[in-house]
């Protein structure tokens, strides 16, 4: 079904966005945390 492909695509985009946001947050914390 088409909606399954849509949900899968949204999930993939969300996963990549989450990884990018987490990576940016980790970089910020490691650089200026302490």
Swiss-Prot record:
Q: Where is the major localization of this protein?
A: secreted
InterPro entries linked: Dermaseptin_dom
A Pfam match is DD_K
Q: Would the keyword Protein biosynthesis be found if you checked this record's keyword annotation?
A: no
Which cellular component terms (GO) are annotated to the entry?
Answer: extracellular region
Which region is the signal sequence?
none
Q: Where is this gene product found?
A: Secreted
Tissue note: Expressed by the skin glands.
UniProt keywords, alphabetically: Amphibian defense peptide, Antimicrobial, Secreted
Q: What GO biological process terms does the UniProt entry carry, in alphabetical order?
A: defense response
Similarity section: Belongs to the frog skin active peptide (FSAP) family. Dermaseptin subfamily.
Functional note = Has antimicrobial activity.
Q: What is this protein called?
A: Dermaseptin-H5
Which species is this record about? Pithecopus hypochondrialis
């Amino acid at each position: 079904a088409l909606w399954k492909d849509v949900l899968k695509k949204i999930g993939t985009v969300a996963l990549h966005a989450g990884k990018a946001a987490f990576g940016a947050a980790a970089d910020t914390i490691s650089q200026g945390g302490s």
